[in-house]
Protein backbone atom coordinates (compact mmCIF):
# COMPACT_ATOMS: atom_id res chain seq x y z
CA UNK A 1 0.00 0.00 0.00
CA UNK A 2 1.60 3.23 -1.14
CA UNK A 3 -0.69 5.73 0.53
CA UNK A 4 -1.09 5.82 4.26
CA UNK A 5 -4.46 4.78 5.60
CA UNK A 6 -6.58 7.46 7.24
CA UNK A 7 -8.63 6.26 10.20
CA UNK A 8 -11.50 7.78 12.18
CA UNK A 9 -12.28 6.50 15.67
CA UNK A 10 -15.84 7.21 16.84
CA UNK A 11 -16.10 6.37 20.54
CA UNK A 12 -17.07 8.27 23.68
CA UNK A 13 -14.58 6.38 25.89
CA UNK A 14 -11.61 8.73 26.31
CA UNK A 15 -9.32 5.97 27.56
CA UNK A 16 -10.16 3.78 24.55
CA UNK A 17 -9.52 6.78 22.30
CA UNK A 18 -6.16 7.46 23.96
CA UNK A 19 -4.97 3.85 23.77
CA UNK A 20 -6.23 3.37 20.21
CA UNK A 21 -4.68 6.65 19.06
CA UNK A 22 -1.29 5.70 20.55
CA UNK A 23 -1.52 2.24 18.95
CA UNK A 24 -2.48 3.67 15.56
CA UNK A 25 0.50 6.04 15.61
CA UNK A 26 2.87 3.07 16.05
CA UNK A 27 1.69 1.58 12.75
CA UNK A 28 3.70 2.73 9.74
CA UNK A 29 0.78 2.41 7.32
CA UNK A 30 -1.42 4.81 9.33
CA UNK A 31 -1.53 8.47 8.38
CA UNK A 32 -4.17 10.84 9.71
CA UNK A 33 -6.25 9.75 12.71
CA UNK A 34 -9.48 11.56 13.54
CA UNK A 35 -11.13 11.23 16.95
CA UNK A 36 -14.85 11.77 17.41
CA UNK A 37 -16.60 11.29 20.74
CA UNK A 38 -20.07 10.57 19.37
CA UNK A 39 -21.73 9.76 16.09
CA UNK A 40 -23.03 13.27 15.57
CA UNK A 41 -19.52 14.75 15.56
CA UNK A 42 -18.44 12.19 12.97
CA UNK A 43 -21.52 12.72 10.77
CA UNK A 44 -21.05 16.50 10.79
CA UNK A 45 -17.39 16.07 9.80
CA UNK A 46 -18.26 13.64 7.00
CA UNK A 47 -20.98 15.98 5.68
CA UNK A 48 -18.62 18.96 5.72
CA UNK A 49 -15.90 17.05 3.84
CA UNK A 50 -18.05 14.78 1.63
CA UNK A 51 -16.50 16.12 -1.57
CA UNK A 52 -12.91 16.05 -0.31
CA UNK A 53 -11.60 12.47 -0.46
CA UNK A 54 -8.25 13.49 1.08
CA UNK A 55 -10.13 14.69 4.16
CA UNK A 56 -12.15 11.49 4.58
CA UNK A 57 -11.11 8.36 6.45
CA UNK A 58 -10.45 5.08 4.68
CA UNK A 59 -11.48 3.17 7.80
CA UNK A 60 -13.98 4.14 10.48
CA UNK A 61 -13.93 2.34 13.85
CA UNK A 62 -17.41 2.80 15.32
CA UNK A 63 -18.61 2.18 18.87
CA UNK A 64 -22.25 1.25 19.54
CA UNK A 65 -23.12 2.85 22.86
CA UNK A 66 -22.40 6.58 22.80
CA UNK A 67 -24.27 9.70 23.89
CA UNK A 68 -25.99 12.06 21.44
CA UNK A 69 -25.86 9.74 18.38
CA UNK A 70 -25.07 6.07 19.01
CA UNK A 71 -23.52 3.66 16.52
CA UNK A 72 -26.82 2.30 15.18
CA UNK A 73 -28.22 5.78 14.58
CA UNK A 74 -24.92 6.78 12.98
CA UNK A 75 -25.26 3.90 10.51
CA UNK A 76 -28.84 4.88 9.65
CA UNK A 77 -27.82 8.51 9.06
CA UNK A 78 -24.63 7.46 7.23
CA UNK A 79 -26.75 5.51 4.75
CA UNK A 80 -28.35 8.78 3.62
CA UNK A 81 -24.94 10.46 3.38
CA UNK A 82 -23.05 7.60 1.73
CA UNK A 83 -23.78 8.55 -1.89
CA UNK A 84 -22.42 12.07 -1.33
CA UNK A 85 -19.05 10.83 -0.08
CA UNK A 86 -16.19 10.86 -2.57
CA UNK A 87 -14.53 7.90 -0.87
CA UNK A 88 -15.50 4.35 0.05
CA UNK A 89 -15.18 4.17 3.84
CA UNK A 90 -14.76 0.78 5.48
CA UNK A 91 -16.80 0.69 8.71
CA UNK A 92 -15.86 -1.68 11.55
CA UNK A 93 -17.96 -1.75 14.70
CA UNK A 94 -15.80 -1.86 17.82
CA UNK A 95 -17.68 -2.46 21.06
CA UNK A 96 -17.38 -3.99 24.49
CA UNK A 97 -20.83 -5.51 23.95
CA UNK A 98 -20.83 -9.28 23.68
CA UNK A 99 -24.61 -9.32 23.30
CA UNK A 100 -25.40 -11.75 20.46
CA UNK A 101 -28.13 -9.35 19.27
CA UNK A 102 -25.57 -6.57 18.73
CA UNK A 103 -23.18 -8.93 16.96
CA UNK A 104 -25.91 -10.33 14.70
CA UNK A 105 -27.29 -6.87 13.95
CA UNK A 106 -23.84 -5.65 12.93
CA UNK A 107 -23.21 -8.71 10.77
CA UNK A 108 -26.56 -8.24 9.04
CA UNK A 109 -25.82 -4.58 8.27
CA UNK A 110 -24.26 -4.50 4.76
CA UNK A 111 -22.11 -1.42 5.34
CA UNK A 112 -20.45 -2.92 8.45
CA UNK A 113 -17.37 -4.91 7.47
CA UNK A 114 -16.82 -6.52 10.84
CA UNK A 115 -17.78 -6.56 14.52
CA UNK A 116 -14.74 -6.31 16.80
CA UNK A 117 -15.01 -6.85 20.55
CA UNK A 118 -12.88 -4.45 22.62
CA UNK A 119 -10.07 -4.15 23.34
CA UNK A 120 -8.77 -3.80 19.81
CA UNK A 121 -5.19 -4.99 19.37
CA UNK A 122 -2.46 -3.75 17.07
CA UNK A 123 -2.66 -7.06 15.20
CA UNK A 124 -6.40 -6.60 14.69
CA UNK A 125 -5.85 -3.07 13.38
CA UNK A 126 -3.23 -4.40 10.96
CA UNK A 127 -5.76 -7.02 9.84
CA UNK A 128 -8.37 -4.29 9.23
CA UNK A 129 -5.80 -2.30 7.20
CA UNK A 130 -4.95 -5.42 5.15
CA UNK A 131 -8.65 -6.02 4.46
CA UNK A 132 -9.02 -2.46 3.20
CA UNK A 133 -5.91 -2.75 1.02
CA UNK A 134 -7.24 -5.96 -0.56
CA UNK A 135 -10.48 -4.19 -1.53
CA UNK A 136 -8.66 -1.19 -3.03
What do the predicted segments below correspond to?
Residues 63:
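Active-site residues of response regulator receiver
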Residues 73, 87-92, 98-114:
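Alpha4 helix (beta4-alpha4-beta5 surface) of REC/receiver domains from two-component response regulators
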Residues 118:
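A Lys-centered signature of the CheY-like receiver
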Amino acid sequence: MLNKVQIAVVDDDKIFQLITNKTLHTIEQVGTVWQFYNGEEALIYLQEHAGEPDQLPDILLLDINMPVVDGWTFLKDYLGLHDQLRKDISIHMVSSSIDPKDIERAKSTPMVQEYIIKPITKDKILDVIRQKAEKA
